Regions:
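Receiver (REC) domain active-site loop signature in two-component systems and cognate sites
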Residues: 63
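C-terminal output helix
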Residues: 114-123
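Acidic, metal-coordinating helix/loop segments flanking the phosphotransfer/catalytic sites
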Residues: 37-56
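Short, glycine/charged-rich "phosphate-handling" switch motifs in NTP-dependent
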Residues: 107
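Charged docking surfaces used in two-component/phosphorelay signaling
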Residues: 22-30
């Protein structure tokens, strides 16, 4: 897990693909956010238990141990997490995954592969939603 001094807030990022985790982390840090990275759903769940002070979250849909939608459903049942905006990402081509993600409470869904520009746009939308809720 990585962490830096927050300026705009803290974002939890969970993806089992190290390259995607690094890319999302780098973009968010350049935007002024502190990032807590998790390599799978279990690490993300632990990060949520250890610190409820997140501005936003980005989850891969398909991860070992606990999936992105499972994490999101857990967050929506906990008062301390239920307002945190979440973006879901996946390389899976099943259109049901996006509808399931939105049904679980995601505010943004990004299919992989994506361009850096697409990712930046979606992350700005996500953190903009987080800032407007605070």
């Amino acid at each position: 897990m990585s962490s830096s001094t927050p300026t705009k807030g803290r974002v939890l990022v969970a993806d089992d693909d190290p390259a995607i985790l690094r890319l999302v982390t780098t973009i968010l840090e350049k935007e002024g956010f502190a990032v807590v990275g998790a390599r799978d759903g279990r690490e993300a769940y632990k990060a949520l238990q250890d610190n409820s002070n997140f501005t936003a979250a980005v989850f891969d849909v398909v991860m070992p141990h606990i999936t992105g939608p499972e994490l999101l459903r857990y967050m929506r049942t906990e008062k301390r997490f239920n307002k945190i905006p979440v973006m879901m990402m996946t390389a899976e081509q099943d259109p049901k995954l996006s509808s399931d993600s939105f049904a679980a409470g995601a505010v943004v869904f990004l299919p992989k592969p994506f361009t850096t520009t697409q990712l930046q746009t979606m992350l700005r939308m996500l953190v903009g939603k987080a800032i407007s809720q605070s």
